[in-house]
Amino acid sequence: MNAVAEMPSPIVFSDSAAMKVAELIEEEGNPDLKLRVFVQGGGCSGFQYGFTFDEIVNEDDTTMTKNGVQLLIDSMSYQYLVGAEIDYKDDLEGAQFVIKNPNATTTCGCGSSFSA
């Protein structure tokens, strides 16, 4: 039996992020898409965030649903994202997804890489 971890998450998936993801999924025309957020080695601070669409929920994924949008985080990335907020900003600096991560001890100027 394949069991996908679905538990209350200390990760915040903001309304604005969920609304933007829903808009992007609608543009793609594939209602099976889910937003996958991950952490990988790289960037100027050691780790960097990644965002992609995925149709598949893996066994070790933690899932969250907000406003009908499903967010997926693999178990390795989850440990770095506990307590973080995944948000979408549209301001003078531009429109982008941002992660506010209290686990990041340092971040680079662009905010896309960090060390923990």
Curated annotation (Swiss-Prot):
GO biological process: iron-sulfur cluster assembly
Chain sites annotated for binding iron-sulfur cluster: C44, C108, C110
InterPro entries xref list: FeS_biogenesis (IPR000361), FeS_cluster_insertion (IPR016092), FeS_cluster_insertion_CS (IPR017870), FeS_cluster_insertion_RrpA (IPR023063), HesB-like_dom_sf (IPR035903)
Source taxon at top rank: Bacteria
Keywords carried by this UniProt record: Iron, Iron-sulfur, Metal-binding
Cofactor binding: number and manner: Binds 1 iron-sulfur cluster per subunit.
Keyword set includes Iron-sulfur: yes
Molecular function as annotated in GO: 2 iron, 2 sulfur cluster binding; 4 iron, 4 sulfur cluster binding; iron ion binding
Metal-binding listed as a keyword: yes
Classification via Pfam families: Fe-S_biosyn
Cofactor(s) of this protein: iron-sulfur cluster
Protein family: Belongs to the HesB/IscA family.
Role played: Required for insertion of 4Fe-4S clusters.
Subunit architecture: Homodimer.
Name the record gives this protein: Putative iron-sulfur cluster insertion protein ErpA
Species name: Janthinobacterium sp. (strain Marseille)
Gene: erpA
